[in-house]
Regions:
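A generic structural micro-feature
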Residues: 7, 81, 102-106, 177-181
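Short helix-to-loop capping/linker segments positioned immediately adjacent to catalytic or ligand/cofactor-binding
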Residues: 75-78, 96-100, 111-112, 170-174
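UBC/E2-like fold recognition across ubiquitin and ubiquitin-like conjugation systems
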Residues: 12-14, 23, 30-38, 55-58, ...
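A structural signal for short, well-ordered beta-strand segments
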Residues: 87-89, 110-112, 185-189
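A short coil-to-beta-strand element that immediately follows conserved catalytic motifs
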Residues: 77-87
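Non-heme Fe(II)/2-oxoglutarate
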Residues: 1-79, 97
Length: 192
């Protein structure tokens, strides 16, 4: 009997957080960005805040993140409890984006989408062996699938939370909406 063994799987957990008031949260994020100088890490244009893990208006989101990490870890099976290591917001105007990057040695990383206008861009995850997969298959596949795709696009959608391994390279496409900003909150988690 023949069978395929799926090895070295890369899980991406997603859930909709229905109990977050995104309209209010978006306003709080915009207000906060007017007082905080921010930083440049992977963002090309736009605003990226400094660490927000102790900012009061995010406390309910932090609680939801903790629950989601605990749920995701049932499959990951890491020892210990999830500890939020860092949290920051991203506000992306027209053509602003995030270059390919990863979150290093963090056990899990994630993003929560607060505001996502039409044409705001997707999040793109690269295969861990991106260069080899791209070279090996060199667009010779009939259809992209989990075995042959060098990258995978997932939608940026308000209320959606993604969790993924911190080592996974990813980027965010440019926001092509000329009038409304894309707002997301990203974070890193380790287990202890």
């Amino acid at each position: 009997m023949s069978e395929i063994q799926d090895i070295f799987k890369v899980p991406i957990y997603q859930t909709h957080l229905k109990d977050i008031d995104n309209k209010s949260l978006a306003k709080q994020c915009i207000d906060f960005s007017k007082k905080d100088k921010g930083r440049v890490v992977s963002n090309v244009g736009g605003y990226q805040s400094n660490n927000l893990q102790n900012v009061k208006f995010l406390s309910s989101l932090v609680s939801f993140i903790h629950t989601a990490c605990t749920t995701f870890n049932k499959d990951f099976d890491l020892k210990g409890l999830p500890i939020l290591n860092e949290m920051w917001m991203n506000i992306s105007g027209y053509k602003d984006n995030n270059q390919v990057h990863n979150h290093g040695a963090n056990s899990m990383s994630g993003v929560y989408y607060v505001q996502t206008p039409s044409k705001c861009g997707n999040i793109m995850f690269n295969h861990p062996a991106y260069d080899l997969v791209s070279l090996s298959f060199n667009n010779k596949m009939n259809n992209f699938n989990n075995y042959n795709s060098p990258r995978w696009f997932l939608p940026a959608e308000a209320g959606l939370l993604y969790l993924f391994p911190g080592y996974l390279n990813h980027s965010v496409e440019p926001n092509m909406n000329k009038t409304t900003k894309r707002i997301s909150i990203s974070f890193n988690v380790f287990f202890k």
